[in-house]
Amino acid sequence: MSSNKNTLILEPQDYSNRSISIYKSMGTVFEYNKDFNNHKEIHIIICRLGLFLDMEFLSKFPSLEIIGSSTTSLTHIDEKVIQDRHIRVLSLRDCFEKISNITSTSELTIGLTIDLVRRMSAYSNSVLKDGTWNRDQFKTRQISSMNIGVLGLGRVGSFVAEVFGKFGANVSFFDCNDSIESHLAKSVSKNALLETSDILILCPSWKHGNPIIMGNREFNIIKEGVLLVNTSRAEVIDHDRLVESIKLGKVSGYATDVLPIKYENDNAGSHELVKLYEDGFNIIITPHIGGRTTDAMSYTEDCIADLVLSHYNL
């Protein structure tokens, strides 16, 4: 079934065997490394999140036709370059129905929220690192007595709202698509959500060109002492205002799975949020692991392979 369409897998470690078989049926499959030099032979690039596909990188691939990314976000791809070169990008945005049963990011969001409220990581560190056994070190609350606001009621937001609703929490949501209805949570205005939420969970979809969702205006009206959780994108929030609000106590805790891209990989330690954590503020940061489970990754890699196959009508 070969169509002589050669594929380069940028991050081949533990990649789905089924997906690799599909790409091999179309042509030669290459695995990327620092010594790779077959750029001119590549028609398809398959990526995760480890590399930023900018103009300099993509210019090395004159025959490139498709980029396949097993992600919902495309912030790791220079969208202007691919538009100018008419390169087709296939991502999980193209198979939302297929990924509706994937819960890995929702699970992480729930875990980060509970950790932020109950201070589990901080308590664990006090025992394991400091050797102290002090159950009175932090004042925490029961989630069932709190108001939870979900900003963005898509796949992740809906799952999160359902779980916390079953805890007995008062769950409200705002979505920019005002036609969304849900039995899982009460629909309110964005202002009402910001003003009343004890815990505000950011789950919006976001792409290049969209406005910031948590900016100066939003930080001015959020509830005093709110706990903020972000497993969406770093770009949805004004980090300068976030840091300022944490220092002032307006935001009493922040848990996130994302940082601005310039701080990812080896630069994370220089971000102001890390410094706030070191100063004792309630900060939790994970290195973009929302979808980083073996079963979810294998499934989504196969989804992209099927999309590529369909694109070439094979």
Language-model segments: residues:
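N-terminal glycine-/charge-rich "phosphate-binding" loop or analogous flexible N-terminal tail
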Residues: 1-44, 48, 168, 172
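Phosphate-coordination loops involved in phosphoryl transfer and adenosine-cofactor binding
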Residues: 4, 64, 144-147, 225
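Phosphate/diphosphate ligand-binding glycine-rich loop within oxidoreductases
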Residues: 43-124
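Rossmann-like adenosine-cofactor binding region
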Residues: 53-55, 177-270
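Glycine-rich NAD(P)-binding loop of Rossmann-like domains
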Residues: 123-159
